[in-house]
Amino acid sequence: MKNKVMWFVLLLTLVTVLSACGNAKFKADYSLEMQDFEHINQRGETVSLDSLKGKPWLGMYIFTNCNSVCPPMTFNMTQVQEKLKKKGIEDYNIVAFSVDPEVDTPEVLADYLTRYTVPDESKWNLLTGYSQSYIEQYAVKSTKLLVKDDPNSDQVIHGIQFFLVDKDGILVKQYDGYAKDANDVPIDTIVSDLETYIDENL
């Protein structure tokens, strides 16, 4: 009788574990096709939508003269990467589109990134080499996020979201990349989503 009870408990535990694993399936919240692009990163390398395909990537909008949300957003992205590194997750990239491309040359972007403790700089692509009007239109068409030059200052208004793009160039998730309370930035969720996506699709 005791053996039967023990086997029943073991079976119930196994079913519970398998159910939990089944719930881990990646679920896309969006299906937004990213527009083609080909730009220059902080290392002077050409980066295109096609060159990024095959791996998922995390994207955001920043600029180096930003005096408000960009520094904490960039820091938050380094925290995401730190947790990915600890988990041994390697099959991804990080892409930051400059929303002030006339100021943000590759050299300026490279210097900007040195202000942060970046676990793996090789996965970061800070992009520039296009016009202000281009990035304003691109942001709306590809990510449904606002980018708008402020004519009364040297600042640029832009979305504070991080976005997850799948291996085929489709935006599938968005997250708050900035919050007044840093604990409200869903770093663990981003890491979990990316890990689940990679496990199921690569």
Where are these regions (language model features)?
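Short active-site neighborhood of thiol/selenol oxidoreductases, capturing the structured segment around
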Residues: S48-P71, M77
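Bacterial N-terminal signal peptides that target proteins for export
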Residues: M1-F8
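C-terminal motif of bacterial Sec signal peptides marking the signal peptidase cleavage site
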Residues: T16-A20
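Structural microenvironment flanking redox-active thiols in thiol-disulfide oxidoreductases
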Residues: F75-Y138
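Short loop/turn microsegments at loop-to-beta-strand junctions
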Residues: M34-Q35, P56-W57, G159-Q161
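Thiol-/selenol-based redox modules, centered on thioredoxin-like
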Residues: D150-L202
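Structural micro-motif
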Residues: W124, E136, T143-K148, V156-F163
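N-terminal "domain-start" segment that seeds a small globular fold
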Residues: N23-S51, P72-N76
